From Swiss-Prot:
CDD domains: FMT_core_Met-tRNA-FMT_N (cd08646), Met_tRNA_FMT_C (cd08704). It comes from the Bacteria. This is Methionyl-tRNA formyltransferase. HAMAP family: Formyl_trans. It catalyses: L-methionyl-tRNA(fMet) + (6R)-10-formyltetrahydrofolate = N-formyl-L-methionyl-tRNA(fMet) + (6S)-5,6,7,8-tetrahydrofolate + H(+). The keyword Membrane does not apply. It comes from Lactobacillus delbrueckii subsp. bulgaricus (strain ATCC BAA-365 / Lb-18). Attaches a formyl group to the free amino group of methionyl-tRNA(fMet). The formyl group appears to play a dual role in the initiator identity of N-formylmethionyl-tRNA by promoting its recognition by IF2 and preventing the misappropriation of this tRNA by the elongation apparatus. (6S)-5,6,7,8-tetrahydrofolate binds at residues 110-113. Keywords: Protein biosynthesis, Transferase. The gene is fmt. GO terms for cellular component: cytosol. Belongs to the Fmt family. GO terms for molecular function: methionyl-tRNA formyltransferase activity.
Length: 315
């Protein structure tokens, strides 16, 4: 079986790596991002890919930056048939990509050339797309610009979050990769170049974009909330306090109130948005507290708000 250097970090990558192991590929090395410290206690957390590597006693590398590192020199000496990445999160040096004896291959979470970059799934959900997919592609120096070996599509349900789409895309990408690698090795597959006129970029979501703008319609706000669930979460600033919103729905009613006003806090928490639209908040998380259903939030804080008043601060 062919030899592989695998690079990945989140669960998406871990699912792909597990598939390669079960299929019998010879994993020469696993490369993942350095451990993170999270929470108040700064607990060290391993990436899902690291967990898989440790469970299977695979050689593990965690460079802060692969380019010009000692780890890169070691990896270049491994002489792998395939270099395979799945949501790794770092730029890869061209000389490393060219060192693969057969091919350097990426499992990308979109239907390229749409959504090149680090946040393809979040962009698909935020833009309200009806479908997304995975692309098995050749890696080149330019980000996500290589020729395509294969694609598979996946519908996005109207209420689905990025996290849920990720969970469905991972096995789809794994299976498509395992189906495609033998065809690459045998030379029977024909690569397809990307149409440069159809390229759309999906750079990492910025901190500023996490705030739900009052310039959005209720539908656009709902899509942003879905896109940033489970990480990092979208939020409103209500009377000076940050309130994360994990789930919301577009209300059937419209309003003449300007954006940012409370329609009602009786039985629901309905806020006006652009275009006379209304958003019902369904699950929220006040600062320093756990996520809660809107009825629990209203039981504790509902009396602070009056129907008809402006409660959302301008962004």
């Amino acid at each position: 079986m062919n030899s592989v250097i695998f690079l990945g970090t989140p669960q998406f990558g871990a699912t792909v790596l597990e598939g390669l192991i079960k299929a019998g590929y010879h994993i020469l090395a696993v490369v993942t991002q350095p451990d993170k410290k999270v929470g108040r206690k700064q607990k060290v957390v391993y990436s899902p890919v690291k967990e898989v590597a440790l469970a299977n006693d695979l050689p593990l590398y965690q460079p802060v930056r692969l380019s010009k590192s000692d780890e890169l020199d070691e990896l270049l000496q491994l002489d792998a048939d395939f270099i395979i990445t799945a949501a790794f999160g770092q730029f890869l040096p061209t000389k490393f990509l060219k060192s693969a004896k057969i091919a350097a291959v990426n499992v990308h979470g979109s239907l390229l050339p749409k959504y090149r970059g680090g946040a393809p799934i979040q962009y698909a959900v935020r833009n309200g797309d009806a479908e997304t997919g995975v692309t098995i592609m050749e890696m080149v120096k330019e980000m996500d610009a290589g020729d395509m070996y294969a694609q598979a599509s996946l519908p996005i349900r109207p209420d689905e979050t990025s996290g849920e789409v990720f969970e469905e895309l991972a096995p789809l990408g794994r299976d498509l990769l395992l189906e495609t690698l033998p065809k690459i090795a045998s030379g029977e597959i024909v690569k397809k170049p990307q149409d440069p006129s159809q390229v759309v970029f999906s750079p990492t979501i910025s901190k500023a974009e996490e705030r739900i703008s009052l310039k959005l319609t209720a539908k656009e706000a709902k899509n942003l909330i879905r896109a940033l669930n489970p990480d990092p979460g979208a939020y409103l600033v209500i009377k000076g306090q940050r309130l994360k919103v994990w789930k919301a729905e577009v209300a059937d009613d419209n309003t003449s109130l300007p954006a940012g006003h409370l329609l009602t806090n009786q039985g629901r928490f309905a806020i006006s948005f652009a275009g006379n639209t209304v958003l019902n908040l369904l699950e929220v998380q006040p600062n320093g507290k756990k996520a809660m259903a809107i009825k629990d939030f209203l039981n504790g804080q509902g009396k602070k708000f009056a129907a008809g008043e402006k409660i959302v601060d301008e962004d």
